[in-house]
């Protein structure tokens, strides 16, 4: 199995501006065939990011992630073998990445795409270049972290990484790490509890200091590029401390919508 964790979606009330943020700060490239009324689709040469308008009844922020596999039908069979109560649903052909949507044992939703199927659109058909700032990890905070970790290892062949100093689980496709964090209500003693689900995304960069300088430059060029403040007030301080427990990041920020992002150098 050669599964790749190469898709993430963000729902945003300011989807166009948020897309420009990732393009400007992290150098992500937009699709050569944009559909601006529907979403902003960007890529880093490996991972594709869809910034989609928040629809009625939906929350903003990280929405789902996606995995590319060699054979979708075989993968669906593996999912059923792992747990017969799990299932998948076929997606409309207009979707640029997904052939199916499915879920893990904790109902965390992910999309499935088949490699070289010809169904990929936008950057998912173009994602093949090298750039200095790339998505390094996608973090998921969920109730039954160990079982979900086993699910992604057994079904997709993601490689467990040995990090014995914390309670998290780390699985790699060889480039991107899926980080699975145990969700505990006690982690939210000094703040409003967050739902289970996607927690944050991380980038590998050539220089953290340069990212900080670029952020200042962007705000000077366009005041709408100002991101959310972190660590203010007692609850903000508690949220930041919990975020900073991720060992894969060194500098912490948000996008325009408030999605948590951490960055670290190669």
What function would you assign to each model-found segment?
Residues 17-19, 73-77, 208-213:
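Short, conserved charged micro-motifs
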Residues 36, 54, 115, 166, ...:
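Residue-level structural signal for beta-strand termini and adjacent loop
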Residues 4, 36, 61, 96, ...:
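Exposed loop/turn and edge beta-strand positions of beta-sandwich/beta-sheet ligand-binding modules
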Residues 80-131, 216-266:
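Vicinal oxygen chelate
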Residues 2-49, 139-185:
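Core segments of cupin and vicinal oxygen chelate
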Residues 1-16, 62-65, 115-146, 198-201, ...:
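N-terminal beta-strand motif that seeds the catalytic metal site of vicinal oxygen chelate
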Residues 146-231, 235-251, 256, 260:
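Structured core of small recognition/catalytic domains
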Residues 46-50, 59, 107-110, 176-179, ...:
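Short, charged/polar, Gly/Pro-enriched secondary-structure boundary elements
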């Amino acid at each position: 199995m050669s599964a790749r964790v190469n898709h993430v979606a963000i729902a945003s009330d300011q989807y166009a501006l948020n897309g420009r943020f990732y393009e400007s700060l992290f150098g992500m490239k937009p699709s050569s065939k944009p559909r601006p009324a529907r979403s902003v689709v960007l890529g880093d040469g490996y991972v594709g990011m869809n910034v989609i308008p928040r629809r009625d009844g939906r929350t903003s922020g990280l929405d789902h992630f996606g995995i590319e596999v060699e054979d979708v039908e075989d993968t669906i069979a593996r999912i059923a073998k792992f747990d017969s109560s799990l299932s998948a649903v076929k997606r409309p052909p207009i979707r640029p990445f997904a052939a199916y949507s499915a879920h893990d044992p904790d109902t965390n939703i992910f999309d499935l795409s088949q490699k070289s199927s010809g169904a990929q659109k936008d950057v998912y058909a173009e994602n093949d270049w090298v750039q200095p700032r790339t998505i390094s990890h996608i973090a998921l905070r969920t109730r039954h972290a160990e079982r979900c970790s086993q699910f992604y290892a057994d079904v997709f062949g993601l490689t467990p990484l040995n990090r014995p100093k914390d309670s998290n689980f780390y699985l790699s496709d060889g480039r991107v790490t899926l980080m699975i964090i145990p969700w505990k209500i006690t982690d939210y003693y000094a703040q409003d509890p967050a739902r289970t689900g996607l927690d944050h995304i991380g980038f590998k960069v050539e220089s953290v200091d340069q990212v900080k300088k670029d952020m200042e430059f962007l705000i000077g060029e366009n005041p709408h590029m100002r991101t959310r403040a972190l660590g203010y007030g007692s609850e903000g301080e508690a949220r930041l401390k919990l975020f900073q427990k991720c060992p894969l990041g060194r500098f912490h920020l948000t996008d325009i919508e408030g999605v948590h992002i951490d960055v670290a150098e190669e």
